[in-house]
């Protein structure tokens, strides 16, 4: 880069695989949010939070060197108001702190708009958002900061929506466009800031719930596998959630106090979901219905919230460790796994009650053709066994091929490549069969040569090459005679 009359050092960047890849997921870096914890200036706290942010990135990217890019679920900065010039300056200082870490010069980052980002154009001045909404129906209600966007990486569609915009019809229009343009994406991941299924004290029972009734059916209808949230500065993961299929059109912001009948009615009205899975300590689901929702704690520790007093029925795991955390999402052809780590130790976070935070969704590869091929191969092998024409060793070798293919068919996490390879291997089953050569069995059912004749031929072969020489000489003589006849015919034609 050329800046202030000088060239910077060269920055190395290498692209990562798009077949199987890893993504880092963080919540609320919120540079500058530690302000108010002591008497230092805003600039001091922005510097302090930026230092911790760099520490998290350094720790995570050193431990997980295969990270393709970073996803940040909103609130990159803390300064919300921009009514004064000093407010605008403070925002710029905080954005400078957010973008300061050297790791961000070689690792892409995709952000979403948090409530602290939403009231200033400074957000969109700092981030390039691919496929950003421009149509009127895709931008209705957009905030000053920008609007929704999406991108494709490998087999996964990533969609980011600005939930500071409560016009969910706008979000549905963008989601519809993204899905229609990426129909072959194996995985769909949605990211937004407000946690509609979180467990933090400050938001999960207020503004997050307002959006819940409207977004849940959209998310369910477009078959998103995972939703990444921020906002509440706690960790949580839900069970698999789907919509209840009912209309929830009457919704308002939560009452100001929880000690009222109105609030209890509000809570009941916001039960707009079904739990598709609620098994305790279930860390892997195979071909599940519904969507899993994650809530990320602060990646910098600039601010934390308490967990809500009573754990909601949709929450499978939650934690407030009061330490910066980050998550890594590993995506393959058939699995999507999310693991959450302590940023200081890189050890996997353990949620309340000793619940592990690792969670895997398995989408099995299509094995229809493989299963049919196994059945056909086994049928042919069984017939070969009954015929008694083939050696035990070759039958065992063919059976081993079928058994190996069956192992792939039984493995929920077998990849599409594994399945194709197993199916191809079955094509060799018949070629593995070797006929018994004991002078008593036909080498070929369609061969009319009698066994006695075969013995004679075998005898010639054993005695030496005399017959072979005789056949060769006879062949030469025949070829010579043919040549003479052809030559004579040509002369007559002339």
Predicted features along the sequence, with ranges:
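Extended active-site neighborhood of metal-dependent phosphoesterases/phosphodiesterases
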Residues: 1-12, 84-184, 188, 214, ...
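N-terminal active-site segment of His-dependent metallophosphoesterases
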Residues: 2-83
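Active-site-proximal beta-strand elements of phosphoester/diester hydrolases
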Residues: 21-42, 155-165, 189-193, 292-298, ...
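Active-site neighborhood of phospho(di)ester-bond hydrolases with catalytic His/Asp-centered motifs
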Residues: 25-27, 69-75, 109-115, 162, ...
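Short acidic, glycine-rich surface-loop motifs adjacent to enzyme active sites
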Residues: 67, 72-80, 182-202
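Beta-rich interaction/scaffold domains
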Residues: 365-452, 469, 480, 484-487
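Extracellular Ser/Thr-rich, low-complexity/disordered mucin-like segments
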Residues: 450-471
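Cytoplasmic C-terminal tails of single-pass
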Residues: 491-494
